Swiss-Prot record:
Belongs to the universal ribosomal protein uL1 family. Keywords: Ribonucleoprotein, Ribosomal protein. It holds the Pfam family Ribosomal_L1. GO terms for molecular function: RNA binding; structural constituent of ribosome. This is Large ribosomal subunit protein uL1. PANTHER family: RIBOSOMAL PROTEIN L7AE FAMILY MEMBER. It comes from Drosophila melanogaster (Fruit fly). Gene3D superfamilies: 3.30.190.20, 3.40.50.790. The gene is RpL10Ab. SUPFAM superfamilies: Ribosomal protein L1. The keyword Ribonucleoprotein applies.
């Protein structure tokens, strides 16, 4: 399915955003969001969609990931300077809602060993799930660092009750080509999730944390 955002429009938006950001340097690395307005969609009746897509370039390099690991994974995490918790540490939280909420807030994502992932509802209750941060599985056949990179590269589109959504697709430290590739991939994936594809898209903008929105569609 062809994109309705031409290459020229895409680069115009991305370059406009990066130039505006370069003129006003902020004290932090601004995130770039893709903002989507939908139409001909009834969140009450139509199926709410959700889907994840892996981008080519990591949109949020500072994303914090924690390993909930068995002994082997905890040792590996320690060796790689990755934050981790073992079953004992999770037991100590004692299903305390406040503590579980605090844990969920401290990290952007979690990875868990197979032996632990089954115990999480029992050890922590529904807190991580409620926060939308239930751990992804980390097997011993996978590279831990590779899996962390994969988690950092993956974005999620989730339709809630409103007709607009936004998702982080990059940051202002990226080259325009990298950002354009991420934006393009995100748009095409999102459109594939929609019932009537492009007929459901009202508007598309890219925007950095502090910058003005740039219209793509």
């Amino acid at each position: 399915m062809a994109s309705k955002v031409s290459r020229d429009t895409l680069y115009e938006g991305v370059n406009g955003l990066l130039e505006a950001s370069a003129k006003k340097k902020r004290g932090f690395l601004e995130t770039v969001e893709l903002q989507i307005g939908l139409k001909n969609y009834d969140p009450q009746k139509d199926k709410r969609f959700s889907g994840t897509v892996k981008l080519k370039h990591i949109p949020r390099p500072k994303m914090k990931v924690c390993i909930l690991g068995d002994q082997q994974h905890c040792d590996e995490a320690k060796a790689n300077n990755v934050d981790f918790m073992d079953a004992e540490a999770l037991k100590k939280l004692n299903k305390n809602k406040k503590l579980v909420k605090k844990l969920a807030k401290s990290y952007d994502a979690f990875l868990a060993s197979e032996s632990l992932i089954k115990q999480i509802p029992r050890l922590l209750g529904p807190g991580l799930n409620k926060a939308g941060k239930f751990p992804a599985l980390l097997s011993h056949q996978e590279s831990m660092i590779g899996k962390i990179e994969e988690v950092k590269s993956t974005i999620k589109f989730q339709m809630k009750k409103v007709l607009c959504l936004s998702v982080a697709v990059g940051h202002v430290g990226m080259k325009s080509d990298e950002l354009a590739q991420n934006v393009n991939l995100s748009i095409n994936f999102l459109v594939s999730l929609l019932k009537k594809n492009w007929q459901n898209v009202r508007s598309l903008h890219v925007k950095s944390s502090m910058g003005p929105p740039q219209r793509l569609y």
